[in-house]
Amino acid sequence: QLARDLSDGSFELPAFPDVALRVREALNDADVSVDKIARIVLSEPVLSARLLRIANSAMMRRGSLEVTDVRMAISRLGFEMVRNTAVSLALDSAFKPPAHGPLRRQIENTRRHSVRVAVLSYVLAKRLADGVKPDEAMLTGLLHAIGRFYILMRAEAFPELFEHPDVLEGLLHDWHPGVGRAIVEAWGFPDGIAVAVDEHEVLDRDHAGRADVADI
């Protein structure tokens, strides 16, 4: 039944969480101020806490003073990192696993994998890929497995799938790139990111021109 739903497109896409949407819309204004972004961030305590934690991490601090308020955190991290952190939080909000069981393990494994891919994508773009923005590569890494999150959450209604992990993995492999593309397009992300989400499993991908974010 789940395979039929996916194949005929009869599935409801999740809404883009409100705080991430407001951050993204504000950042579309090239003249947006740190104060305006800070006001949006402060409306979501979890996002505020996460930004403070990242700003005070060993990678970001580098001998600087401890960041104690959201405005300082935004100034240290930059707008793109704020956007990516809001998207990461949006994924956590949109795809909350149950407290226990195989679905939770699958979701948590996918979440850890997405973070690793995001970090590696950032490093590769910064060091190797001329023309690919590191922050865009990081965002794409965070989103590349979003279809997998969605299918896993739908699979909760079919508990027998978790008794046959090979069948579930087959569904995930076949459908998560296309479902992921549908979600990121519905959420209004750029075409380049949608293509990367759709084609990230195509290891022999070939195209004219320089490397793009899908190649990363």
Where are these regions (language model features)?
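Conserved alpha-helical "signature site"
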Residues: 1-145, 149-157, 163-216
